[in-house]
Amino acid sequence: MGESDAESDSSSNSSSSDTSSGSDSDARSESSSSESSGREEEEAKQEESAKDAKKTDDTDRGEKRAKERDAGQDEQPTEQKKTPAAEPRSERQHISHSAGVEKQQEEAVAAAEAESEKLNEAKKVETPVQRKEEAEASSVTKELNSPKAQEENAARELEERRKDEEQPVTTNGSSKESPVEAAAETVKPPTADHIEEGEITDKDEDDLPTKEEKKAVASKSPPKETQRKQSRSPDGKRRRPRSSSRSPSPSSRRRRRSRSKGSRTRSRSKSPIRRRSNSLERRRVERQRRHEERDKRDEERAKEREKRHQKGEPTSSRRRDDSREKKRSPERKRDRSSSTPKSKSSKTPRHTETTETNADNETVTEPAAKITERQRKTVDVLTSRTGGAYIPPAKLRMMQSQITDKSSAAYQRIAWEALKKSIHGYINKVNVTNIAIITRELLRENIVRGRGLLSRSIIQAQAASPTFTHVYAALVSIINSKFPNIGELLLKRLVIQFRRAFRRNDKMVCMSATRFIGHLVNQRVAHEILALEILTLLVETPTDDSVEVAIAFLKECGMKLTEVSSKGIGAIFEMLRNILHEGKLDKRVQYMIEVLFQIRKDGFKDHQAVVPELELVEEDDQFTHLMMLDEATETEDILNVFKFDDNYAENEDKYKGLSREILGSDDGSSSGSGSGSDSDSDSDGESGSDAEKKAEAGDIIDSTETNLIALRRTIYLTINSSLDYEECAHKLMKMQLKPGQEIELCHMFLDCCAEQRTYEKFYGLLAQRFCNINKIYIPPFEEIFKDTYQTTHRLDTNRLRNVSKFFAHLLFTDAISWDVLECIQLNEDDTTSSSRIFIKILFQELAEYMGLGKLNAKLKDDVLVESIAGLFPKDNPRNTRFSINFFTSIGLGGLTDDLRRFLKNAPKSVPAINAEILANAGGNPFRDGSAPAGNTKVAPSSSSSSSSSSDTDSEDSSEEDSSSDSSSESSSSDSSSEPKKKRKRKDKDKKKSKKATKEKSKKTKNKKKKKKAEKEQEKEKEKQRKSKKEKEKDKKRKKEEKKAAKKKSKHRRKSQESSDSSGSEDSDKSTSESSDSSNSSSDESDAEPQAKIKRQEHVEKNKFRGRTQDSDEFNLEGPGSKNRFQPNGNGQRRRDNSTGRERNRENSSYDRERNRGNSSYDRERKRGNSSYDRERNRESSYDKERKNRNAVAHDRQRKRDRSRSYERPTIRENSAPREKRMESSRSEKDSRRGDRSSRNERSDRGERSDRGERSDRGERSDRGERSDRGERSDRGERSDREKERSRAKERERDRDRDLKGQRERKRERDDGSRDRSRRERSSRRSKGRS
């Protein structure tokens, strides 16, 4: 009986200790309530403890005796430990006996409760577990009072004291236990409530006992009636129950301690207070052991677990008593240590059961056993409530890296913390410039799993820095386009935040929330209806703060609302206008409303809806949330907290695939620490829908070309720092350019060369050296040549010259192939002035380097025939003539010999076709001024064949000979004029039959009539002027001729002799030239263009000093009004006769103008029409008369001016009569000299005009039929004006000369009148008389 009581007591104590250690967290959560109730119990029971002090002393004495008796009965504790299953019957007896004892104890507890409730019924609250403990303690004390138990206990105490002296004592005062016992005591499964945050537990362990287990336990336990019967002592006296609340007096504590020595066998180290006071390390060790040994649940463990749940924790009073045991005397400690064998013996049934279960569980391993102790420490440090001890960051990262199991809570918790940290860091770093980079980094993190963290971070960052609201809104718009659920969550939280702040009258939070919502409206994340609802809410019941918030909100999204819903914002502004008119608000708010109206009037120009740099999402890609102000109800704050994910690895892979689709192939650097995926069911659907969306940007491309700029800078500095090209090439070859950078080097050579003021051979040699070193540089230079030719119009003259010389150097050194010339098409349509200048300088440079012969031989090479087909075209005679004239004009006519032969041997029908093309085009194909010819239109009567051109030449020459004085020319031209006239008439008859020529002739006739009428009017006016001038001249001549008649006759004779001699020479030369030209025209009628080109070359040879030579002889910039010729050989062209031209150049500007006038009027005589010829002859005669009159008037004017200068009344009045005679004689002499010089000039002019007419006959014959009469009249008028201007200039010069002469003569006379002696005067008189 005593053994069973002891065993039941020990089992109950051990189970209670297990419960207390296992439910540590539950005790913490209820500590405050339990401690407060314990304190009330102590205060209420202090009075009761004083009354019961005497009774407890008696019971203590009885308990000592009962212990001694029971010591003898408990002799075989170890045998029961080894063979617990061998005696099932005895065990059942012990259980039934303990049940009876428990029944008696319950009766004692009920009596004790009745007494205690009388004192403090309201304060004391006892649990069923406390009642059971009280019952067990009272039953044990009752049994231990028997005499046999006292004797046995006394004997056993002696033996146990000896054993205790030999056993070493632990640090906490308890004796050592066997390893099996220690494992059984330390490995105690906790209750379901004792789970710390982040603790790894088994789910099966936390389950409550099932109904079947409860039924089995209830069937095994004895009924309450038997317990009540056994609760009384053998003598029939009811025993006093042990009170749960103990008195604070030391005597009562000693009595209770001594009374419970035999029953409370648990050592000090096993108390819950001791366990709680131990270090964290010990608790972790216990938890580890508990996880390792807990695998299966059998029936026995289910029973124990049911008991543990029923009993619960010990009361707070017992915990205080256990804590006070530390202060007890060494005797109490020795007494307690002496009772440890009994406790060991009392625990044997439980230990046997646990050893059986441990033996069975050794073969089973749970997943939780995979986590090492180091990993568990890391998790505890991260997840414990107190934070744990400080661990350096490096060590912490090392500990975290050792956790690799993604399915564990430790790994997921670490990943969650890293995700939170990375999202917060990215949000704090975002700005306008790096928003694209930050967005890509955020999309690499699992923002679907951490969408709550992302929304919270963005809202907090925006509230902290409202000036960056537009940046955060742009970031949200980008994320919303990919994950609309994130944008919706953030918008919900913002709306709820605004409503809460509006109810609390928190203006600052309202301002920040509305500002963010306004920018989300601008970015099309939120619908404009939400903005209008907020504005209506703020303005409906206006206050100072609400109107201020509304104004701030309107400034942010007013432009967008005006674009989207003008009526809605108009209604809001009307409400604001009414508020302003009421005037109930503060003055400051009224001013703010007025400012807002002004901003609206300006069109919100200072408050743009979206900054251009932040307009990153297309309108079609954006997802707009239509959310009303009352719809947002749930903020989903649970998303801000860590949540364990069973399918962590699967969701992580899903998000990685989604991130790759969004970001493209640039996902290799994604961080694994923050990766993960949301475990919600809706995330899969969202990922499926978002997977169809593509990335906004691909690979990162450096648009600034930083590396290219650095390379160009290095090449430029290397080129400029080198002394010669060899050193520069050596340095550049050391740079080890990457593949593809060769073309940049070639471009730098050309750019540096073009930048120079003049071409430097350094760059050509440098490029040549690179082409010779490596052939990889040849294709880039050839490509650059073609590109440069196509873009020559972008280069100025200096750059164009340097570039063309640069490529000329590469060509003549054969650094690049001559096949690059195939890109040049030398014709009128495909060239520009810049391209012609480029070709000109290129070939001139090649001719200078190679010589004309070598260059011609190179171009005639069979390999280059196809490449130079564009330079020397043979497809069209028009293009052929253009090429011939171009190269001839730049001084390289020798290159066109083959083209001339080709054009000479071409059939005659080709020029006719060319003439039709020209007639349809309506102008000269050489509009760029390739030869010095007049700007004339194609006459309808012009013939395209070379024979017709020769006919017109001979006819014009015959007509001119008939009007001139030279008989030799007329005889030579008349001989061949008659048959040619017949041919010409036939050609004219054929051409007149054409409709196009008739229409053109009509137009030209109308124009000619108009011009004739205008000319006649001008002529009449000129005649009137001339008549007036002639009258004046005649009066002057009569006076002057009487004085100088003799001297004029002498000078006339001399001038005639000189003019006859020079005229004969000129006539001989002109006749020879005209005969040569006529012969050449008659002999070579088929090759007229070639003859013209030869004449052009002859012109180039006969350059004379007075004329400024053009650089190219080919007008590359455009045609001049006077310098044009027709490519078919029939245009006007000016012959340059050496003798006549040289004399004309040497004469004064007046003579040149006169020759131009004569030639212009002579050209008008070239038409075959007789009426027109007569009119032309009449005009020429008028012109001659007018010129003569002008010359006479000019001479008279000069004489009049001189005679005025000589008339000095002062000198004549003061001087002697002899001096007056001298002055008159001088004036006569001067007048005679002027007359002679003027006559000489007139005679020279006539002779020159005759010579010019004879020398220009060939030229007139070429140009006669192509020049329009209107243009001739215009030229005549221009020549007249130029003549008048030149005459005015000459008059001014003469006047200046005369004034200077007068001044000098005056000075001489003044000096002579003073110093001359009478001798000199007499000698002068004698000379004058003689």
UniProtKB/Swiss-Prot annotation:
**Residue span of region Disordered:** 1-377, 660-697, 926-1330
Domain MI stretches: 710-826
Protein name, UniProt field: Pre-mRNA-splicing factor CWC22 homolog
* Annotated ranges, domain MIF4G: 420-603
GO cellular component terms given for this protein: catalytic step 2 spliceosome; nuclear speck; spliceosomal complex
Task: Give the Basic and acidic residues compositional bias ranges.
Answer: 46-94, 115-135, 149-166, 191-201, 208-236, 278-307, 316-325, 1013-1033, 1089-1110, 1133-1195, 1203-1320
Modification type Phosphoserine: residues: 219, 221, 1111, 1121, 1180-1181
Biased amino acid composition, Low complexity: 9-36, 99-113, 355-366, 665-678, 941-951, 964-976, 1072-1082
Basic residues bias: start-end ranges: 252-277, 980-1012, 1034-1054, 1321-1330
Q: Where in the cell is it found?
A: Nucleus speckle
The annotated regions of Acidic residues compositional bias extend over 679-689, 952-963
User: For this UniProt entry, what is the primary localization, expressed as one broad class?
Assistant: nucleus
Q: Name one GO molecular function term.
A: RNA binding
Q: Which family does it belong to?
A: Belongs to the CWC22 family.
UniProt keywords, alphabetically:
mRNA processing, mRNA splicing, Nucleus, Phosphoprotein
Q: Name one Pfam family in it.
A: MA3
Its biological function? Required for pre-mRNA splicing and for exon-junction complex (EJC) assembly. Hinders eIF4AIII from non-specifically binding RNA and escorts it to the splicing machinery to promote EJC assembly on mature mRNAs.
Modified positions (Phosphotyrosine) are 1182
